[in-house]
């Protein structure tokens, strides 16, 4: 089976492959970032978004892969074979997990459309011969300030003003949202 873990999010393995392997932070840094920004939502029993679910699965996969690597390290007698397994896990599997973690953390942080726009911009930049491209690659965190995304075929919708309340009416109080998870 040819399964692309990015397809349902509008991206692809090929689109992420334009980013060099040293672009992605270490798994430890990515896990720390996910924990710092999204711990409550990731630990919540409630469904928050497909990106939260994918992030949970990638984190669980990495944990299981580390368990396997520990087992192999303890049970494989031949040091050369042990080194081959550890190297394969770190280089190949580590890169795939780093890409997954980066993609979903970035989508949650910047928005899916911005991340997709960034991947396309970077792909165009990297494929343009050096003599014809700007010296610096696009930067994700600055993209929303410079990118204008317009919906096709529609002019901006005008909002009609909401009906005014009489001054004697008091607005309804909102229920406390402290019990709800913050997705």
From Swiss-Prot:
Q: Say if the entry is tagged with keyword tRNA processing.
A: no
Q: Which residue ranges does the UniProt annotation give for the motif Bipartite nuclear localization signal?
A: 158-175
Q: Which UniProt keywords apply?
A: Capsid protein, Cytoplasmic inwards viral transport, DNA-binding, Host cytoplasm, Host-virus interaction, Microtubular inwards viral transport, Phosphoprotein, Repeat, RNA-binding, T=4 icosahedral capsid protein, Viral penetration into host nucleus, Virion, Virus entry into host cell
What cellular-component terms does GO give this entry?
host cell; host cell cytoplasm; T=4 icosahedral viral capsid
Q: Where is the composition biased (Basic residues)?
A: 149-176
Q: Where is this region: RNA binding?
A: 177-183
Lipid biosynthesis listed as a keyword: no
Which Gene Ontology BP terms does the record give? microtubule-dependent intracellular transport of viral material towards nucleus; symbiont entry into host cell; viral penetration into host nucleus
Where is the segment annotated 3 X 7 AA repeats of S-P-R-R-R-[PR]-S?
A: 155-176
Q: Primary place of residence?
A: virion
The record describes its quaternary structure and partners as: Homodimerizes, then multimerizes. Interacts with cytosol exposed regions of viral L glycoprotein present in the reticulum-to-Golgi compartment. Interacts with human FLNB. Phosphorylated form interacts with host importin alpha; this interaction depends on the exposure of the NLS, which itself depends upon genome maturation and/or phosphorylation of the capsid protein. Interacts with host NUP153.
Main function: Self assembles to form an icosahedral capsid. Most capsids appear to be large particles with an icosahedral symmetry of T=4 and consist of 240 copies of capsid protein, though a fraction forms smaller T=3 particles consisting of 180 capsid proteins. Entering capsids are transported along microtubules to the nucleus. Phosphorylation of the capsid is thought to induce exposure of nuclear localization signal in the C-terminal portion of the capsid protein that allows binding to the nuclear pore complex via the importin (karyopherin-) alpha and beta.
Family of the protein in this entry = Belongs to the orthohepadnavirus core antigen family.
Q: What is this protein called?
A: Capsid protein
């Amino acid at each position: 089976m040819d399964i692309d873990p990015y397809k349902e999010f509008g991206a692809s393995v090929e689109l992420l492959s334009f980013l060099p392997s040293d672009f992605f932070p270490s798994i430890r840094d990515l896990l720390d970032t996910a924990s710092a920004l999204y711990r409550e939502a990731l630990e919540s029993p409630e469904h928050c978004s497909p990106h939260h679910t994918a992030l949970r699965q990638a984190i669980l996969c990495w944990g299981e892969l580390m368990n396997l690597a520990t087992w192999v390290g303890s049970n494989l007698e031949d040091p050369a074979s042990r080194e081959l397994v550890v190297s394969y896990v770190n280089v190949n599997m580590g890169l795939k997990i780093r890409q997954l973690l980066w993609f979903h953390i970035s989508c949650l942080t910047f928005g899916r459309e911005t991340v997709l726009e960034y991947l396309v911009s970077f792909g165009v930049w990297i494929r343009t011969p050096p003599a014809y491209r700007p010296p610096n690659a696009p930067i994700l965190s600055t993209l929303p300030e410079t990118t204008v995304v317009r919906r096709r075929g529609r002019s901006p919708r005008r909002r009609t003003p909401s009906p005014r309340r009489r001054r004697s009416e008091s607005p309804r109080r909102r229920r406390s949202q402290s019990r709800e998870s913050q997705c």
